[in-house]
């Protein structure tokens, strides 16, 4: 009998999420992803942010910090071993088997005021393994804006082409960037889809897509339903929704959404239904510009970097403190696959199917849900929620 998940809630054996919850609470990349998902869900609309892009910007700042400022930043990144592990995920070798248009590019840059805060001689080498660039510029000149914009466009696949204006008193600015594109293993179809997305405020313009796949994994607990949908490179999209009547806000804020996403990504307690999965999910393009992430970083425990007396002596001798942290992000999901880009700025002033198949498990994401996109190595590239608008 065909299982339809999404039209109504189905009870399922409860699966303990303790180990996943512990993993996501440990300082580091996954903890940052969990906090970003919760922080963004305080908005009323759909949103998308990039944990990976933010992490690289923090890592760049950390490599320039000293003393108590360094200790505080390291406590958020999880220490030396966790930092190495995170960078290994983010800069993992490109898989050999990919779609022709596959791309995952992550990079960072630091732009210092050539007049007031010349760079330490070897800082460029310090961030070389992060695909990093370090340069001294005149922030009052049009040339500086052009250089930063060119770098940003190159490293976001042309999705973001204009770097923000920097004040003349800027000591240095960090810009990290990410671009990702991949194709589904099992493409989805956007024609003759009769499923209607049930947003809090009904909308008729939410285009759905659906299709059958044999390679996805299904997580079904009393709290959540989650589905992973793989891409050609080994990257995967994970969609998660409440299975107990909880609102999307409660589902996300309780941590249940991220726990379900991680468990599904890690294949802990998941199944691959013998009949495959018939997935229905909206196709969408989300974009956010200039999202302020400073408050979220403070909630993680980063305080000294924002205060006078912050020590970034491995970057420059000049006194400096972080004044703002902003991120721009875009993510498009369509029947062919996923494409996304992001930038983060720290501004610092002074298998084969069997012949006889059971029917697939039908999973319909027809009401608000949380989602994440992971790279082939497991790095969380994007997290967000979709409400239909």
Q: What are these model-derived regions, one by one?
A:
Residues 329, 335-389:
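C-terminal soluble interaction/assembly domains
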Residues 44, 89-245, 263-355:
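Non-catalytic, conformational "gating/processing" segments within enzyme and secreted inhibitor domains
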Residues 187-190, 240-242, 250-255, 345-346, ...:
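Composition- and surface-driven signal marking solvent-exposed, interaction-prone regions
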Residues 73-77, 188-196, 248-258:
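Short Gly/aromatic-enriched secondary-structure transition segments
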Residues 33, 223-226, 328, 366-370:
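Short glycine-rich loop/turn motifs
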Residues 1-139, 150, 386:
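Detector for small/aliphatic-rich hydrophobic stretches
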Residues 48, 237-239, 372, 382-383:
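Structural recognition of the beta-strand scaffold that forms the well-ordered cores
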